[in-house]
Amino acid sequence: MTLRIGIIGTGAIGTDHARRINRVLSGAEVTAVTDVNRDNAEACVAGVAPGAQILGSAEEVIAASDAVLVCSWGAAHEAQVLAAIAAGKPCFCEKPLATEAYGARRIVEAEGAMGRRLVQVGFMRRYDRGYIALKETVRTRLGPPLMIHAAHRNPTVPGRYRTPMAIHDTLIHEIDVLRWLLDDEYVSAQVIFPRATRHTHAGLRDPQIVLLETAKGVRIDVEIFVNCRYGYDIQCEVVGEEGTARLPEPMAIPTRLGAMFGQPILMDWKDRFIDSYDVELQDFLKAAAQGTAAGPSAWDGYAAAITADVCVQAQERPGAILPVTLPARPALYA
């Protein structure tokens, strides 16, 4: 049986997921789409989803599909995911699950009332081969982890990008993947601001350093530098009792040319994790065919949202160490 997939939001990521489902993955076909900008929906159908119908609302897409992808504007995610849960439809939601923690909590509560998992959150780094290998190395070879040094660098960001977006749009990936990497929970967060780059603007303090502490005492520093100019660069080094391990660089051809040795650095985030997107969506489709969800859960999205909210508060109080408090984990997510 071919799974009927509906996509809510056909901007860049929604359209790319439609291409992925129809041309790369197996077991599903995009059959319905919607977007607040009909031109986006028409371009998606014309380009990568010729068999899909364009519908007028998220609710219509949910009703017409076996499972849905929520790829719309972040502020719309909560209502659309809740509608999918109410309809009993498996739902893949791009981050953020909700723009604030209380919205993510409502999703967790709704899913709990259904009694089974229906939501997968789009934290694709858990599917990256490099992170998977790093997690295994941390688990088996380094001894207890003590520290993590990480960096998330973008060449540039648009003028509408503001200081809090460094948390909700950028750091959110580190918040999730480092929690997963350590199998640990955060207990505090702190933000400090180094000297600002001349390439930023009045509404954005860049770079930033976020300091996190976990329940097991691991100290984490994450550099967020979204106007670094030179490329899209993700770094992660784990320091354990017995040694250190680093996230591998993306595969690239090293060259010796013109009296120089080097290799290129990617400029686009989509290229850095392109294989991970394929694997995470195939995982979703496999579970959705059974009427459920796999991978990063609504609880993971909630935990990330709580931590992100505290980090934004810490931005407003530079240097202050603020507590991160998670409620008890429901049995559904044990």
From Swiss-Prot:
Record has Phosphoprotein as a keyword: no
**Enzyme class, spelled out:** oxidoreductase
InterPro entries hit by this protein? Gfo-Idh-MocA_inositol_DH, Gfo/Idh/MocA-like_OxRdtase_C, Gfo/Idh/MocA-like_OxRdtase_N, MI/DCI_dehydrogenase, NAD(P)-bd_dom_sf
Q: Where does the source fall among the domains of life? A: Bacteria
Q: Which UniProt keywords apply?
A: NAD, Oxidoreductase
Biological-process GO terms, alphabetical? inositol catabolic process
Single GO molecular-function term?
nucleotide binding
What EC numbers are recorded for this enzyme?
1.1.1.18
Q: What does this protein do?
A: Involved in the oxidation of myo-inositol (MI) to 2-keto-myo-inositol (2KMI or 2-inosose).
Q: Which family does it belong to?
A: Belongs to the Gfo/Idh/MocA family.
User: What protein name is recorded for this chain?
Assistant: Inositol 2-dehydrogenase
Species annotation: Cereibacter sphaeroides (strain ATCC 17029 / ATH 2.4.9) (Rhodobacter sphaeroides)
